[in-house]
Every structure is written in structure tokens, then in C-alpha cells.
Amino acid sequence: MYVEHFFKLPSQTKELLQNTPYRFGFGLLSEVTFYRSYSRLKEDGTNEHWPDTVIRVTEGIFSIRKNHALNYHLPWDEEQAQIFAKEFALSMLQLRWLPPGRGLWMMGTRYMYERGSAGLYNCAAVDTSNLAHAAEWAMDMLMVGAGVGFNTAWSGKATKPDKKHPKIYVIDDSKEGWVKSVRLLIQSYTDNGPFYRFDYSKIRPAGSPLKTFGGIAPGPEPLKRLHKKIEQILDDYLDKKIDKTRCVVDLFNNIGLCVVSGNIRRSAEIAIGRPGDKTFLHLKDYEKFPERKEYGWISNNSVVIENLDDFHYIDAITSLIASNGEPGVLHLENMQKYGRFGEIVPDRAWLSNPCGEIALESYELCNLSEIFISKCSNEEDFQKLIEYATFYASTVNLLPTHRPETNEIIARNRRIGVSVSGVADAIEKFGLETIIKWLRKGYEKVRTVNERLAKEAGIPVSLKVTCVKPSGTISILAGTSPGMHYPLATYALRRIRIGKTSKLAKLLIDSGLSFEEDIYDKNSYVFAFPIHYDNPRSIKEVDIYEQMLVLTMLQREWADNMVSNTIQFDPTRYDAKDLSQIVKHFLPMIKSLTLLPEKETIYPQMPFESIKKEEFEKRVTQLPKVEWNTLSGHHADSERFCSTQSCQID
């Protein structure tokens, strides 16, 4: 049991939260997103409503801090904690700021109290020098919901095992059993370990409920496929059919595919390579590597530019970016030397999380929180929300994970990422000068609050405290543009796929919401929702240079970690040579960069489709009222991590 001392809101505070009006930002789309992704089943079999989730999260985060204080015999003022918790919960209820999706799903659950904090974290990364250990750790983190970054550092040392006399390993019906089986199989190649065949008989059948973690069991089939694939990849490597880079990335992509195809968790990865590695540069070229099309999409791929000496690689990199938007670029010198631009903050990190907002050491995790700056009425309002978001992020890492190698690094760095979303909306609404002022003073506020909380807890202050995350699903709840990005359109249709057997789909259909058969997945329906962004300009009206200037402004004024970005460009205006000059000009001032060519591709049931104002207004009047109190027994689908504009899949 990781938590023994619990914090409970009094009945009058809970009643206040249950009876206080609130409004999701995009109306019915936001409501459906909440119930699809974050509404857990309560003990009585009904689904959480938004106030229930707010209460669970509030009691969970305050339980972590209370538990830490009492376990270490530190001061704890219950009366003051209750006062602050009430304000904290009310601001969250109104969607002024939010925890990350992992926090909405896992905070305050029995799984967290019994198993520790790993399921609360967004960001993870691992060095692959020890291939078997790295693969085990990565699968472990993917299965609890973190996005994982990995490099290609493995030495390549391996030998074929003796398959004639295998040992039998009976896989336990648990996450631990799955990840151990993967480690044992890889070790039979890399560590001269015994070769294993696996007994899957203990694994519960597909469709069984996962009562503690939440969700539905996938059965043994995804793991069986993964074991066969791992064996094939390592055999192909030793038979010289693929090289070391392919071996590492193929292994990790297939681990991610197992997690996704099993519907265990929505996984996301980033593969991190060297700019001179030609195999790595062409991993997304499915004409060159056609077999990778099945699983190559699992990871974003980025190359590490260590310093100015590596800038000669940029021409080759941008020639690839010009066609498909990959690879991304990480600037190692800036990651390790600076906090915000120009501020010296030594950092050992050499890896990144999948969306590029947090630089990480191997086996490190980082948790986030998010303020919707465009929803603030003034600077004082923004400063108050910083207190809540910083409290949340600074408290999660007081609770250990189940991994000792991870706890060691978290205890040293205490790295957090307080993020802002709706940045583009706020610039249009308040003006750039005002937002720069808010962010500059806001950063100092985050630091002040974090230092106070660290002192109270008797721990080091956080190495770094701010970032800008991409905010796909969470920004939909609040109704803002995601992260630093401009919306794809001011008026749009947002489509969501929901499984036909889902009780959520049945409720929507029974309520009168129109739907279509999914032409790509016979087991799903597609629902379309009209939305309006509070921004007069869409991304099509914002040039690449203006986007880059917003990125560098955020790295200078706010983010001492990194700024997740997908910078879109018109390929008819900017060729590879133009992109090379842009990257060389801006990269010395930033830490991560993703460039994506705009494509006018139109296809049926697009996730996001621009519409006219008149169509928006017509469709809004056709939306039904859904009686959410009738929803029960729906198993939420948890969030999809790959949520930047370049890779959102619903």
C-alpha cells in the first residue's frame, strides 16, 4: 500500500461541487470526450460525472501530500488544506486549469493507492544500452499509460539461443507477467539466457473487466503476436537481414503495437536517433522498408543535433521533412545547458518524451498540468490558476512508483511541467505584449510556489518546472486551441469513432445524435460534432515564420523544459532549401522542432473538417440533449497520447 493516510472532502464541499454549474468548452463534443476517455465506473456500476471526477482527483492529490507529510512527521494543517482543496476543486470544475489526461484517469483510484504513481505520469524515456531491461521498462510504462521515448544506443551484441531445449515460462495474469516475458525472451539473445516458450493459460480471456486499473482485458493474443515478432526481429538481425537501428526501433515499435492492438492502453513512442544514421532517417520510407508500414506509425522519429558542429546534417534532414514531416529535431546542447532561453540550468537529460515537451534522463518520468491562458480574465486570474496547477504537478512526485531505478531519478530531479494552452487564442484576444508579460511573471510564480511546496515537503526544488504540451484531448474539454497551436479552422466538424458495442454509442444514438458506419472499422460508428474556436485566425492564415516566432517566444518567456510544436508550412511556398535556412536560423534558440507540410487531402470521415459558419450554426441547432445520468456500465477508452495536430487519431 503506497498511501495509508487519506484526505477526504467534507460532505458540504462535495455537495457544492455537485450543485455548482459548469460548462464544457465545446459543448457536446467535450461531454462525449469526457465520458469516452475519463469517466470511470463507480462502485455502484454507474459512470462518473464531471463533479465526481473532480472530487476523486482532488481527494487523490491531497491524499498524496497528506500521506507524505504524516509519513515523514512533517507539519500538516488539515483546516488550511480543506480551504485550499475547495478552491482547487472549484477552479478545476470550471475547467480553468486541468491535470493531464493520466491524472484525470488515475488520480485517486485504488490502483494508485495500492501500486504507486507510475500510472499518473505522461512522459517517460529510456536509453537502450541494456536492451532487455529497456524493453521491459518501456512496456511497463506504456501499459500504465505513459508515452515513451527511446534511443538506438544498444551495442548490437547478441547471439542466437539454443531453441532445441526451451524452458517453459507460465505467464502470470498481470502487467508484471507480460513485461517479464518480454525481458526473458530478449535476454535469451542478448545475455546468453535460456530460451523460453510461453504458457498463456493463466491470462484472462478477452473482454474481461480490469477492475483495479479500469478498462477491458485484451486476452493473450496481442502478447503471443509480440513474442513471435520479437523472435523474428532478433533472428533477422543476427542473420544480417536488418541492421542494429532497425532491430531496436522495430522491437520497440512492436511493443507499442502490442499495447495498442490489445487496447490495453493508447501508446505513443518517439524514436531518437543520430542524424548521420541513414537507416534511421528512412524508417518512415515504406517503399524502402515496406514491412515497417504495419508498425512504424507507432513512433514519431527525431534526430539529435548535439551542437553547431552537427548543423551540416540539416540540409539532408529538411529534404526528408519537406516530403513527409519527419524526422523531428532535438537540440541536445540547449536541452542540457539551458532552462528558458539564455538561463543556465545544467541538466543531464539526453532523451525526450514522444511529444517533445520534456527532456528526460533514462528511466525518468515527468508529470504535467495545464492552464488555459485564453480563459483567464486578467493577470491576477492567471497567477491564481498557477497556484493550483503547480500544486498538482509538484505533488504527484511525492508518491513513489513501483520502479526503484525511476524513483532514484525522480527524487533527484523532481521535474515537472506546468503548461499553458490556448496560447494562440490568447495572443489574438489580449495581444502579444500582454501575453509576454503574463508568461514572464507567471514563470516566476511557478518557481515561487514550487520552492515553497518543496520546502514544506523536505525535498529538492524541481530542476525544471514549465513546458508547453500539445494538449489534444484535454484542450477539447476546455474548448481552446491546443498548446501553442492555431486551430486548423475557426469552424469545423470534429469526428470521433466509438465502438458499436459501447454503451456510450448506444446512449448517443438513443438520444438522436446522427451517426455513420465507420468505413475503416466495421466495429465502430462515427459521430460528428460542430465546433467553433474562439480565434479569428486559423493555421492557414499563419505563416511558418510567425509560428516559429511564437515557439521561440514561449521557449524564452515560459518553458524551461521544452515546447511541443508542430509547425505547419505550405510546401508550394517553402522547399527543402528554405526549410534548411529556417531550421538553422531558429534551432539555436529552441530545444525541439517538428515541421509538417500542409496537405489539402480530403477523404471520407476525416477527424477534422473545416466548415462554414452557416453550416456550424445549422448543425448546432440539430444537436440533441443527452441525459448523461442514464449512462452506466461504460468502460472509458482512456486517452490517446499521440495528440498533436500531426497525429491525432480518433
From Swiss-Prot:
CDD domains: RNR_II_monomer (cd01676). The active site is at 355, 357. Disulfide bonds join 123-366. Its EC number is 1.17.4.2. One of its GO terms (biological process) is DNA replication. Belongs to the class II ribonucleoside-triphosphate reductase family. This is Probable adenosylcobalamin-dependent ribonucleoside-triphosphate reductase. It comes from Nitratiruptor sp. (strain SB155-2). The gene is rtpR.
